[in-house]
Structures are given as structure tokens and as C-alpha cells.
A protein has these predicted regions:
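ER-lumen resident redox/N-glycosylation machinery signature
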Residues: 1-148
Length: 148
């Protein structure tokens, strides 16, 4: 995620504290960066950023087109948008597929999260991406009574 801003722009100044809070609260979960378009016009043009502040979320790398965030400039809203875009390598484990999960890739250790959440936690998504080559991540939701 990148914030494109100009240090002397009033709207950019308004978002600064919220973006800093976002970076602190989501440390280790989201990669958060910023580019001053006054200092680096070429980079801003490369990403087709012509007005500031602009927040762009990238899923895998900066080579993809990214998606512009157009919602509320409050750190929780921005974080919610970005975490929905995160890649996840977490398998949903059910009573029907748990054997396949444990038999898949026998050389890898398996991590299972038992949760009451209806969606995968951002930190678990981040861990699954970070360790996808070494570990298999699975999630068992509370509706899977047979597995609990």
C-alpha cells in the first residue's frame, strides 16, 4: 500500500496522522509506504497519480496496476479495504476435507487455527503468505462442530 502525497498540500497533511496510525497498527500485516510527489514526480506519473493524496493498494507487487482507495480517510477504513485485498494461502478445513488437508504435502508442517470468526484474520493471511513454502495453514470455523 502506498500513499502518494505532497508535503505542502493541505489534504495530504490531513491524512498524515491517520496513515501513520495505520502503519503502526498494521505493522507486520501490511506493507505500508509513502511517496512525496513533489520530490518524485516521475514515480507518481508512472502510477498515474495526478492528484494527492492518493492511496493505492497492490496485491502481490508494484508491477500490478494496484487499486485506488476512495473511501473514508480513517485508518480503520483504509486497513479494512487493504486487508480484503490481501492474498491468502489459508485453506478452510471442514469435516469433509480435513483428511485431504493433513495428507497434502506431507513434508510440510500444518498450522490449524480454530476460530469463531467468519473471515480469515489479516495476521493469519500475512503469515500464510510469508511461510507458504514451508507451512500449510488451515482454518477451522466454529460451525465445524465435528472437528472441535
Amino acid at each position: 500500500m502506498i500513499l502518494f502525497y505532497k508535503w505542502n498540500d493541505e489534504e495530504s497533511k490531513k491524512i498524515k496522522d491517520e496513515y501513520r496510525t495505520l502503519a503502526e497498527k498494521m505493522y507486520g500485516v501490511l506493507k505500508v509506504g509513502a511517496v512525496d510527489c513533489q520530490d518524485d514526480e516521475e514515480l507518481c506519473e508512472e502510477f498515474a497519480v495526478y492528484s494527492v493524496p492518493t492511496i493505492m493498494v497492490f496485491q502481490e507487487s508494484y508491477s500490478d496496476d494496484g487499486e485506488r482507495y476512495t473511501g473514508n480517510i480513517e485508518w480503520r477504513s483504509i486497513a479494512n479495504f487493504a486487508t480484503k485485498k490481501m492474498q491468502s494461502f489459508v485453506s478452510i478445513v471442514t469435516g469433509e476435507n480435513y483428511k485431504q488437508f493433513f495428507e497434502r504435502e506431507p513434508t510440510k508442517y500444518k498450522i490449524l487455527l480454530f476460530t469463531e470468526r467468519k473471515t480469515t484474520a489479516p495476521i493469519f493471511k500475512a503469515l500464510s503468505k510469508q511461510y507458504k513454502d514451508k507451512l500449510l495453514f488451515g482454518e477451522v470455523r466454529k460451525s465445524e462442530i465435528d472437528l472441535i
